[in-house]
Amino acid sequence: MAAVSVVNVERSLARADDRASPTPIRDFAHGLRKLRKFQYLYLAETAERGIGVFAAREFAPGDIVMMDFDANYYDQVLSYKELCAQKIDLKYPLQVGPDRFRVPSGSLDDFLNHSCDPAAGIRMYPHGIVVVALRPIRMHEEVTFDYSTYLNNPYEHLICRCGAKECRGIVGNFDTLPKDRQERYMALRVIGDFVLEGGVVDGAG
């Protein structure tokens, strides 16, 4: 399984850092540098879901798989109305609060795919996130999380093709999960606080 893009990019990054380079290129180079700090993970193509994040070693339950802390982590946050106005596909942003969605920024966690039987879960902090293993993760296994653990948006329902034995077929809000699954995720502390607070998404406009 071949890794994607993070290898042998030093020359390209140096050119991109040139002040004559357009700002988007410099920003992209900065994003690639962020990817390299996750030494036990890599990006690769999945069979049906585009690029995913894969484990370069084994992880035990409770292990930290990745951490992404940055004072600016939540800078690129939009409301639902702003997402729609900018025609951003709803399957890409991560909901981080009531009517607050963090758009992709070039970090490795942008490529985490959904699974109804996830290998990992996300814990949110004021300056970023921690991804923890929920079960043993094999080397070269895809690192996934359950999107419903960070979803409280009545306008968003995604068709699921995760391939898990217990695939739900639809990815909906946290409160659509079976009760035992909700309780498990709460016990593991891998849900967004806002999914329990009844946050409101403004879809008018």
Positions of PLM-derived features:
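Catalytic cores of histone-lysine modification enzymes
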Residues: 8-121
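C-terminal SET catalytic tail plus cysteine-rich post-SET Zn-binding segment of SAM-dependent SET-domain
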Residues: 2-15, 116-205
